């Protein structure tokens, strides 16, 4: 539910009739709600380098997760499904492709297309997002360095 691309990239895509595929639409699983301040990451887990996953930022970002949980409970769905449904509702030229390392995530993520948000629900989400400050980055410079390969 990162909104930083709404200022320039998404309006440009819309104007030029270009589709947009958001990178990591569930913010590396953050929007799934399955991680908390006590979650321990090991080895080469990318979340070790993402400041959104440090304990104090997880706590500060709890209002976003609470909002998603409330809507998910009301719609008999998951926070991840609500996040994806919001994206699909908001832009008809957007195609989120969430990561799916487990079979059950496939059904869960595809199920987001069946969730219909009313205009009132959508507007409420937008209003709440306007009030929420997101702490920490979803992709930090360290991650960019990890994935960057320079052509020689």
What are these regions (language model features)?
Residues 137-142:
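Short coil/turn segments at secondary-structure boundaries
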């Amino acid at each position: 539910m990162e909104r930083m691309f709404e200022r320039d990239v998404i309006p440009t895509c819309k104007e030029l009739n270009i589709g947009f595929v958001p990178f990591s639409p569930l913010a590396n699983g953050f929007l799934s709600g399955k991680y908390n301040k006590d979650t321990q990451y090991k080895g080469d887990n990318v979340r070790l380098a993402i400041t959104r996953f440090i304990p104090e930022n997880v706590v500060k970002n709890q209002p976003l997760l609470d909002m998603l949980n409330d809507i998910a409970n009301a719609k008999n769905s998951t926070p991840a499904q609500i996040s994806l449904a919001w994206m699909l509702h908001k832009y008809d030229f957007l195609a989120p492709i969430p990561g799916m390392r487990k079979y059950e995530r496939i059904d869960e993520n595809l199920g987001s297309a069946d969730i219909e948000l009313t205009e009132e629900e959508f507007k409420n989400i937008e209003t709440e997002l306007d009030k929420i400050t997101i702490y920490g980055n979803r992709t930090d410079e360290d991650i960019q360095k990890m994935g960057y390969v320079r052509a020689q």
